[in-house]
UniProtKB/Swiss-Prot annotation:
ATP binds at G65, P66, E67, S68, S69, G70, K71, T72. The gene is recA. Can catalyze the hydrolysis of ATP in the presence of single-stranded DNA, the ATP-dependent uptake of single-stranded DNA by duplex DNA, and the ATP-dependent hybridization of homologous single-stranded DNAs. It interacts with LexA causing its activation and leading to its autocatalytic cleavage. This is Protein RecA. It comes from Azotobacter vinelandii (strain DJ / ATCC BAA-1303). GO terms for molecular function: ATP binding; ATP hydrolysis activity; ATP-dependent DNA damage sensor activity; damaged DNA binding; single-stranded DNA binding. Pfam families: RecA (PF00154), RecA_C (PF21096).
């Protein structure tokens, strides 16, 4: 850059700083770049699929899927992991359906959890904004977008038409709180439901509620689905779950993770550690026996998982090795369970 341009730029920057305050415009090379801080989801496979070890702080995340697919379980698991790091968490329960006993079973410290059950969508989003601006809350869950009913709809008659009210409410709220979320370094997770578009002949007829604004403002969008049942003898004790990362602004998208959610217990984390440990050679499997560093730890996956539960230091060591290998690995080096989805899959999402 020649001298005249340098002087002109310096004058412009000085004027901007004088008018808008120091830091209004910065040169990126003047400050050391730092990795985006993340909060674990409670699922090792999903943390790796997200590319940074969890959900990004200072960003908006959307988690959507059909009923009983594990959306609330995943968010409560995220709260439990955040609380282990000393984070303050809030749950905006617009559906009025939060079960404290179930949350406690997943490891959530319900005594320290902030809970709000707002009457209207406007109230829910205003509470969310105020919590963000306090700079004292690290994780906020909004459950769910579909339950954020505008005040005009609540006060109106049952059959009244209110076209686009919820979409306008979400658009206005997200414009307002996005900057505050970044400044507060707060993770805000919106749970959303799926609806069917009428008259779609080709492509995916599924869409999410609340208009398009959340799709744009969200840095990460997760599609969670129940793919099967986990059985013990003839009794169903959980569900097989698949999560696709359909949008990711902080790492490559279209990755997916598969794990089990056990009823009353949550995400089967030790099962993930065993599966990924075997695929990476950190654990050895010979017939039905699993071994770690030459010592047998159990016959069958359930017994091996029990060993890891009784020996958390071994589980932590294996998990750390898995994270160290996979979070720095290219896509070609990842196990099949964490493979990328085709780039053209689910474009409608």
């Amino acid at each position: 850059m020649d001298e005249n341009k340098k002087r002109a730029l310096a004058a412009a920057l000085g004027q901007i700083e004088k008018q808008f305050g120091k830091g209004a415009v910065m040169r990126m090379g003047d400050h050391e770049r730092q990795a985006i801080p993340a909060i674990s989801t409670g699922s090792l496979g999903l943390d790796i699929a997200l590319g940074i070890g969890g959900l990004p702080k200072g960003r908006i995340v959307e988690i959507y899927g059909p009923e009983s697919s594990g959306k609330t379980t995943l968010t409560l698991s995220t709260i439990a992991e955040a609380q282990k790091q000393g984070a303050t968490c809030a749950f905006v329960d617009a559906e009025h359906a939060l079960d404290p006993d179930y949350a406690a079973k997943l490891g959530v410290n319900v005594d320290d959890l902030l809970v709000s059950q707002p009457d209207t969508g406007e109230q829910a989003l205003e509470i969310t904004d105020m919590l963000v601006r306090s700079n004292a809350v690290d994780v906020i869950i909004v459950d769910s977008v579909a339950a954020l009913v505008p005040k005009a709809e609540i006060e109106g008659e049952m059959g009244d038409q209110h076209v686009g009210l919820q979409a306008r409410l979400m658009s206005q709220a997200l414009r307002k709180i996005t900057g505050n979320i970044k400044n507060a370094n707060c993770l805000v997770i919106f749970i959303n439901q799926i609806r069917m578009k009428i008259g779609v002949m080709f492509g995916n007829p599924e869409t999410t509620t609340g208009g398009n604004a959340l799709k744009f403002y969200a840095s990460v969008r997760l599609d969670i689905r129940r793919t099967g049942a986990v059985k013990e003898s003839d009794e169903v004790i959980g569900s097989e779950t698949r999560v696709k990362v359909v949008k990711n602004k902080v790492a490559p998208p279209f990755r997916q993770a598969e794990f089990q959610i056990l009823y009353g217990k949550g995400i089967y984390r030790n099962g993930e550690i065993i599966d990924l440990g075997v695929q990476l050679g950190l654990l050895e499997k010979s017939g039905a026996w699993y071994s770690y560093q030459g010592s047998k730890i159990g016959q069958g996956k359930a017994n091996a998982a029990k060993f890891l539960e009784d020996n958390p230091e071994v589980a932590a060591a294996v998990e750390k090795s898995i994270r160290d290998q996979l979070l720095a690995a290219p896509a070609s080096a990842r196990p099949a369970a964490l493979a990328d989805e085709p780039a053209d899959a689910d474009l409608d999402y």
